[in-house]
């Protein structure tokens, strides 16, 4: 199982946990597994077509998955995903 580091804004959706584990062969599978186990995360992670929301950044072992293979990026059991929602303000 891969480890997912949960940002503070999403922690209420996962019972306050800083990290959770999820199964999957690639980033998309792992995030969908997270959303299945914690349904309140689905709308924050995914758009209506199942794509990653554009304001959500996901890193696999410190590499932005958007410059890798996106949701199709392979994930190993010892890998760590970090979810970082983009911040905006003024």
What do these predicted regions represent?
Residues 1-89:
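Ubiquitin-like/PB1-type beta-grasp interaction modules and other compact soluble beta-rich domains
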